[in-house]
From Swiss-Prot:
Entry-linked SUPFAM superfamilies: Cyclophilin-like
CDD domains from the UniProt entry: cyclophilin_EcCYP_like
Catalyzed reactions: [protein]-peptidylproline (omega=180) = [protein]-peptidylproline (omega=0)
Organismal lineage: Bacteria, Bacillati, Actinomycetota, Actinomycetes, Kitasatosporales
The protein's name: Peptidyl-prolyl cis-trans isomerase cyp18
Keyword annotations of the record: Cytoplasm, Isomerase, Rotamase
Primary localization: cytoplasm
Organism of this sequence: Streptomyces antibioticus
Length: 166
């Protein structure tokens, strides 16, 4: 299992990544970490009873360029439970690139149920092993609208650095 540390303006979060169950997703995430993609990005979507999403925007809400989308691995048996990390995507099940989210409660409706557009779900590829208190603090920040986006923290929550620990 790979481990990644996110140093954020709200504190430190450590993610344990499940290479065995989500190999393509983990390799994709690690490629973004290695390239420095996440450094200086924000948690741009925060919904207190759902999830916190980041990895795609700068503090001034400029979207970062990404690599090609990856195949959805949501059929790996991992569940969108509290403190798990999963890939964000559009309505296309196979559109995930760099953005990810941390579930802040059990979100069973995001789990894979079938290989159909509505059943694919969202690929879980890891979990928070340290910094659950930081995740809880982030989910409680005040949010508003910014540049056409909803649920954006009024005070940016910045991922100052992301690094591979092991």
């Amino acid at each position: 299992m790979s481990t990644v540390e996110l140093n954020t303006s709200a504190g430190r979060i450590v993610l344990e990544l499940n290479d065995a169950e989500a190999p393509k997703t983990v390799e994709n995430f690690l490629a973004y970490v290695r390239s420095g993609h996440y450094d200086g990005t924000i948690f741009h979507r925060v919904i207190s009873d759902f999830m916190i999403q980041g990895g795609g925007f700068t503090p001034d809400m400029q979207q970062k360029s990404t690599l090609a989308p990856i195949q959805n691995e949501a059929d790996n048996g991992l569940r969108n439970d509290n403190y798990t990390v999963a890939m964000a995507r559009t309505n296309d099940p196979h559109s995930a690139t760099a953005q990810f989210f941390i579930n802040v409660k059990d979100n069973a409706f995001l789990n894979h149920t079938s290989k159909t557009p509505n059943g694919w779900g969202y690929a879980v590829f890891g979990r928070v092993t340290e910094g659950q208190d930081v995740v809880d603090a982030i989910k409680g920040v005040k949010t508003g609208s910014s540049r056409g986006h909803q649920d954006v923290p009024v005070q940016p929550v910045v991922i100052e650095s992301a690094k591979i620990l092991g």
